[in-house]
């Protein structure tokens, strides 16, 4: 008799789990990337792109600097301020950060909102290495 509550709880858990819908796994798509040298070529060729820097303002103006013409929109604010980029919907947006991690996140956010975005591999560290 003292095991009866345990049996009831176990049965409830089993029945409850049987009724759960199977969660479909969403395939993880690879984030599109671009090499720094290819970004430099696009800039030199005056291709109509948007350089979007997703670092903080302090980093943007800091020792690593920023690419001339880049627009600053920190990744932490990207979702809330996404509408500010609507005029660039038809452009390729090259997303930049310090080393490529935050820009990968920013690229995914932009793609989820229908933008044509690519992550600049290596970020400003790689950019400065090629200068």
Model-derived segments and spans:
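Active-site flanking residues adjacent to catalytic metal/cofactor-binding acidic residues
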Residues: 52
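Short, surface-exposed ligand- or partner-binding patches at beta-edge/loop junctions that are enriched
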Residues: 96
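Rhodanese-like catalytic fold shared by cysteine-dependent sulfurtransferases
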Residues: 2-8, 15-49, 57-92, 101-131
């Amino acid at each position: 008799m003292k095991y009866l509550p345990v049996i009831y709880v176990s049965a409830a858990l089993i029945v409850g789990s049987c009724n759960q819908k199977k969660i479909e796994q969403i395939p993880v798509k690879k984030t599109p990337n671009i090499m720094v040298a290819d970004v430099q070529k696009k800039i030199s060729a005056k291709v109509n792109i948007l350089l979007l820097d997703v670092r903080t303002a302090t980093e943007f103006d800091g020792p690593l600097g920023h690419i001339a013409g880049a627009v600053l929109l920190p990744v932490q604010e990207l979702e809330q301020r996404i509408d500010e980029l609507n005029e660039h919907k038809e452009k390729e947006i090259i997303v930049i950060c310090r080393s490529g991690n935050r820009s990968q996140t920013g690229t995914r956010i932009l793609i989820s909102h229908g933008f044509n975005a690519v992550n600049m591999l290596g970020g400003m560290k790689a950019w400065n290495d090629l200068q």
